């Protein structure tokens, strides 16, 4: 087993608690389904939110998905002029036998524009 990192992001429509919870649910579900992984494979997850998203902690949404005993951390993404607004990001550290080349990162909705180099 190796320690690997999975990345993902999603853009939500507004600073709304329900939209943040739904966005994280969609992002985490897609990321872990695409990589055939579960909470048992996760070492830790770091979430960031752009400064315009303050209605809920992204980690709270992950807890609701069953990541109860996984160390989770939230932070604010740096406020760069012209950066895409309303984006939630995740960096998940996982244990897996897969190589880096076998991992699939997930950039959803408008956030897909952040990584045009990745396959859909």
Question: What annotation goes with each model-predicted range?
Answer:
Residues 1-120:
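Terminal domain-initiation and capping elements
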């Amino acid at each position: 087993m190796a320690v690997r990192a999975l990345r993902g992001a999603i853009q939500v429509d507004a600073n709304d608690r329900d939209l943040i919870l739904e966005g994280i649910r969609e992002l985490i579900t897609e990321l872990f389904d695409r990589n055939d992984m579960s909470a048992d494979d996760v070492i830790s997850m770091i979430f960031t939110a752009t400064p315009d998203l303050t209605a809920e902690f992204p980690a709270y949404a992950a807890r609701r998905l069953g990541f109860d005993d996984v160390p989770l951390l939230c932070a604010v993404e740096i406020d760069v002029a012209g950066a895409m607004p309303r984006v939630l990001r995740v960096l998940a550290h996982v244990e897996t036998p897969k190589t880096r080349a076998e991992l699939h990162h997930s950039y959803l909705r408008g956030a897909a524009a952040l990584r045009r180099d990745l396959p859909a």
